[in-house]
């Protein structure tokens, strides 16, 4: 084969591969279009979700619903506009389950992937950014392990995804090329109003567990926002003893566990139950071994690193009260069969 023939053959192969990828992406889009929904809360478009069960179970972000005392409707091209009822919530992973009315035939739905995608894998998000409907965007799994982010005054466990994700995508499905669900969009990293190119997704295993139990979860909280020592400004670090390690309490929620224990903002947590902590993830993973209402012992010192002492802290509960009445709303439009 001469060089001219080789180049022609290579070009044809590349063109065929491109067409195959385009067809696969179009099929993926159509699949997401059928199984994804928009969620109206008190008649306003609040976020997105996806059907994950043929009986009409919808998975979305907890912050889209916020609490059960709301009028919830679900809207999609395939279903029309229907009532929805809140089944369960996992505030620690920003997840909520909704239930759609029964219908004669199974609902279109997304299957959960069996194994989380590896770091660097391409995945896709579907939703309604800034009130624009039916948008699919790509992203990359940016971190192998889950981590914790401080969102709306509480820590949630998330997966980091590299991608520009705007408001309105909340609750939307992240899927792989095969259309299998790998996560639910939660929020994103921002400095002020500037997006930093890192999105936060609810972990796959948390979604799987919520679907299995269909019960409100119980996770403990300290009622505080913390920063790692090495995040602090040079002037602050210069005033600390060189051997100081731990986490700086930057925000104390009034009436929360830290506040009730008399620990002030600026204090430094160096251990929980005699186990040293230097990173947020270390502290929060230890914390979540406990149930709300249990007591832990925190080793804390003053803001200057002195006056180290051990303080008992009775843990609070993360998220809304599950005993709040669940609303029953009217069907606005009959579903499409």
Locate predicted features.
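Bacterial N-terminal signal peptides that target proteins for export
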Residues: 1-7
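Bacterial N-terminal signal peptides
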Residues: 8-15
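Protease-domain processing segments flanking chymotrypsin-fold serine proteases, especially trypsin-like
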Residues: 18-44
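C-terminal cap/linker of serine protease catalytic domains
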Residues: 23-29, 84, 107, 129, ...
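Conserved active-site neighborhood of the chymotrypsin/trypsin-like protease fold
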Residues: 36, 42-46, 53-135, 158, ...
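Terminal peptide-recognition signature
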Residues: 37-39, 49, 56, 60, ...
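Active-site loop architecture of trypsin-fold serine endopeptidases
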Residues: 42-47, 64-72, 106-107, 126-138, ...
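PDZ/PDZ-like groove recognition
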Residues: 164, 215-271, 275-286, 301, ...
């Amino acid at each position: 084969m001469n060089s001219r023939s080789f180049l022609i053959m290579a070009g044809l192969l590349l063109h065929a591969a491109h067409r195959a990828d385009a067809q696969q992406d179009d099929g993926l889009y159509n699949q997401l279009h059928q199984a994804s929904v928009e969620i109206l809360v008190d008649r306003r478009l609040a976020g997105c979700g996806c059907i994950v069960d043929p009986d009409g179970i919808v998975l979305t972000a907890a912050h889209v619903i916020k609490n059960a005392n709301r009028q919830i409707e679900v809207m999609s091209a395939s279903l029309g506009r229907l009532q929805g009822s809140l089944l369960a919530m996992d505030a620690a992973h920003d997840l909520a389950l909704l239930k759609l009315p029964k219908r004669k035939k199974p609902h279109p739905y997304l299957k959960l992937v069996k194994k989380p995608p590896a770091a660097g894998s391409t995945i896709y998000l579907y939703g309604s950014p800034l009130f624009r409907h039916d948008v699919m965007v790509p992203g990359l799994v940016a971190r192998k392990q889950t981590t914790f982010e401080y969102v709306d005054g509480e820590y949630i466990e998330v997966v980091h995804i590299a991608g520009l994700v705007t408001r309105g995508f909340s609750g939307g499905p992240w899927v792989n090329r095969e259309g299998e669900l790998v996560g639910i969009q939660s929020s994103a990293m921002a400095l002020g109003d500037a997006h930093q190119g890192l999105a936060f997704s609810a972990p796959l295993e948390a979604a799987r567990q919520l679907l299995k139990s269909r019960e409100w979860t119980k996770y403990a909280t300290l009622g505080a926002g913390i920063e790692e020592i090495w995040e602090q400004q040079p002037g602050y670090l210069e005033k600390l003893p060189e051997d100081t390690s731990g986490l700086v309490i930057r925000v104390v929620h009034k009436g929360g566990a830290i506040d009730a224990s008399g620990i002030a903002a600026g204090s430094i947590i160096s251990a929980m139950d005699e186990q040293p902590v230097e990173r947020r993830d270390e502290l929060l993973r230890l914390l979540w071994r406990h149930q709300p209402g249990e007591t832990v012992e925190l080793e804390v010192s003053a803001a200057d690193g002195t006056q180290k002492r051990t303080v008992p802290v009775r843990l609070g509960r993360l998220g809304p009260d599950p005993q709040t009445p669940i609303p029953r709303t009217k069907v606005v439009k009959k579903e499409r069969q």
